[in-house]
């Protein structure tokens, strides 16, 4: 029976739909680390969406019921929808009209040894006096959680132990105030 999307318990049933899509957020959902997978049919999925934070990835057969579905744990007023195919992209526009705004998302390079450490050192050394760069530890994790503007730096992790095991991030502080950050 196909129709109303269901949360998939055996997430690996959707793996074939996502194919070799090299996207960390999708794999986090498939491996049940974070996020959820919703499908058109739990026993034989043909359409799927992986939802993690502000991101939603569509795979398999483009289905209107999947595109228009909002999981009960999605409270934000927006979501970044990433279509696997042109059919999914067209369905997003059909369903959301002017609210769907196409954008280019810049991907992080995943190749080994591509990161330029000198560029990073230069950025760190250019911090103005009074600003410091710190790795996100338990104290900064708690600070991120308590500040609306930077909750997203750590919001996908249920607690600091999970973050310490699976995440990494850095924050810039001016005095005791967090002013910038980047995190997985």
Regions found by a protein language model. Give the residues of each.
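Residues that form generic nucleotide/phosphate-binding pockets
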Residues: 13-17, 28-29, 69-72, 91, ...
């Amino acid at each position: 029976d196909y129709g109303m999307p269901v949360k998939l318990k055996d997430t690996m049933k959707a793996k074939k739909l996502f194919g070799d899509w090299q996207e960390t957020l999708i794999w986090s959902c498939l491996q049940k680390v974070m996020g959820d997978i919703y499908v058109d049919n739990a026993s034989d999925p043909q359409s799927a969406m992986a939802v993690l934070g502000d991101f939603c990835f569509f795979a398999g057969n483009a289905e209107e019921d999947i595109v228009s579905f909002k999981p009960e744990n999605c409270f934000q007023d927006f979501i970044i929808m990433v279509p696997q195919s042109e059919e999914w992209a067209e369905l997003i526009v059909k369903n959301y009209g002017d609210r769907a705004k196409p954008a280019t998302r810049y991907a992080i390079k995943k190749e080994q040894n591509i990161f330029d450490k000198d560029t990073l050192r230069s950025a760190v050394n250019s911090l103005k006096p009074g600003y410091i760069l710190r790795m996100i530890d338990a104290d900064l994790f708690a600070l991120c959680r308590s500040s609306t503007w930077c909750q997203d730096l750590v919001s996908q992790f249920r607690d600091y132990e999970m973050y310490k095991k699976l995440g990494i991030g850095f924050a810039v502080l001016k005095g005791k105030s967090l002013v910038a950050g980047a995190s997985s």
